[in-house]
Amino acid sequence: MASTLADSAFVPPEIPRAFARRSDGFRHAAAGGLWLAPLVYLEHARFGPGWYGKVVSSDPERLLAWAVSKAIPRRALEVKSLPDLDMPRAGRRRLPGYHIDLWGARLALAYDPETLARARQRSVSLERLQPGTGDDQDRAGRNIQDPSAGERGR
């Protein structure tokens, strides 16, 4: 990290790091670092369907410093424990953890443009799904409704 002047009160916030393996990201976050979790596409989410990401850490002050530097309000901080991956799976304890959800335009505050472009290329629109091939189901017996069907008879 770049040094700052001795009289300066501003220290640039840490940049969240992405990891190829989620377990490495969890370990980094549990040690107090900022982990940029992988993007996920959520069909049914709080802010509607789309790509979601998050910055995770066990250090709430470090996470808030990053958020404030991106004009994300402090109220965006959420509490969610982290798994202690250094323990056996059976009886694994949970460690204090925090995250800030990112969606829509906020994704560009943390994720590089190439990562966002690759994620959008992986998106599949409902119109491209083929009935009967299995890609129209997210679990057995559940079909995705045609978006033009809507509520009939209104």
Predicted regions located by residue number:
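Long, contiguous binding/interaction regions
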Residues: 29, 33-36, 41, 47-48, ...
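Long, low-complexity, intrinsically disordered segments
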Residues: 145-154
